[in-house]
Amino acid sequence: MNIIEEIMTKLREDIRNIAIIAHVDHGKTTLVDELLKQSETLDARTELAERAMDSNDIEKERGITILAKNTAVAYNGTRINIMDTPGHADFGGEVERIMKMVDGVVLVVDAYEGTMPQTRFVLKKALEQDLVPIVVVNKIDKPSARPAEVVDEVLELFIELGADDDQLNFPVVYASAINGTSSLSDDPADQEATMAPIFDTIIDHIPAPVDNSDEPLQFQVSLLDYNDFVGRIGIGRVFRGTVKVGDQVTLSKLDGTTKNFRVTKLFGFFGLERREIQEAKAGDLIAVSGMEDIFVGETITPTDAVEALPILHIDEPTLQMTFLVNNSPFAGKEGKWVTSRKVEERLQAELQTDVSLRVDPTDSPDKWTVSGRGELHLSILIETMRREGYELQVSRPEVIVKEIDGVKCEPFERVQIDTPEEYQGSVIQSLSERKGEMLDMISTGNGQTRLVFLVPARGLIGYSTEFLSMTRGYGIMNHTFDQYLPLIPGEIGGRHRGALVSIDAGKATTYSIMSIEERGTIFVNPGTEVYEGMIIGENSRENDLTVNITKAKQMTNVRSATKDQTAVIKTPRILTLEESLEFLNDDEYMEVTPESIRLRKQILNKAEREKANKKKKSAE
């Protein structure tokens, strides 16, 4: 037997391990759903829900994938393990670890939008791991589809990211995941009602895992899960050897220590289910339970052959904010979990599975510094806690400054904007004011321009709302972390207008709103309960303005209360959680409960606020 034949005998041809990566909303999760439907995995009677791979309510509502999911499909006797990864760079910690578990990637790109910032981010991670790529140009049925140009853009991106010759020779499949069609031709007329071209391309091009099941076990934890019945679960790949239920094994910890434990349960992935199995071999993607304090990057080996794999690198947080117990006048009225103990327990529980998150104590037992990969990362955590019944307050997000080689540095983001040409001047000016550097400007046809900028992350805090207003809602902005660069001195970004602040507690009245709305934009409806120091709108000028929004019209013998019913006021602007976060200034908090999102001044009393401001100015 020659060397080539010997190597061939050591491959597990019955398995392929792939990750599906893409920009947000390019159809990745829909594609996975369709692969599940058309494979031999699901029972014919099984009805698959739309976005079946997205298990989290927020994921389904926003159409984004936050947590990596794993599933497996069977096709012509081959088991294809599929990792569905987040498409947003804020969840890049997940993306990096998944790349360690697979041998190839399916890159999904929109046939019209082409390559986007997050496409760049996830592809860079895949190429760094020397993974074999396949490109699926999705949404080929769009009237505006430009598949040939998009493939050229993908090739340019591969070259720019340093792909080797083998990676540059990627196969391309054209598909419409929502219609369940695909083809090797870029002509939409050639689409076939089958996913077979994608399945066949995966099996033909993605390498089979090496079968070294007879060697000592090596299993590395890439993801974490938690189950009330079995405790903490480590999900990862068996890189070498075999593991069975009941095996006595050693866990090599991140700090260099080791712990012995018994494998109590093993789980394999079948369709959308996680099923108990008795044994797993090299190349399998599995879940292991039995060790309560198992963590991402740690290695499981036999007790008599301890050999840890290199620790997985996890991107550091770039943004932080203060989480506080809710101490507003309305504290405890709407939430189930309101105490510092409950809030801290919930934050610590999040650390069990989210390794890109940091939670640090402060000098107060009611405050914590929470750091993450971006605004989206932290806003998802806040929204999740609010849905679970928690009350809390958070401060304005701020970037994390690092010292690199003795130089203070801050995070910069690569920003890509698609806007009608008529707004490009305003966009360029606004990002230049936020210390952005324009890298590229391309006319994409149909009166559209694509702008690419490098902008300090500080400059993007609160920019989204301004951008949408500037482009009348027609602009599309995507951004992703690029690198740390020397800190730019001075203030960047921030809110240009002051707040309208309630001076009294009570219910907002139509009468008061009518007199106040000429001063700015109102955030509350008539009848909304307010308190002193609560922000009820945005001033049209730079300064904060204290107003009485609870004042009722005095009744006279001539006029009656029914007269007010004909009063017409402007529709208030009700802020979303993200918009509220963007609105915040340094002296303000966002109050979050299961029922409400409120903005408030940190110091509620007007006289005390003015006193603190004078003290601050004299100190400067």
Please tell me what each predicted stretch does.
Residues 1-620:
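Structural and coupling elements of P-loop NTPases
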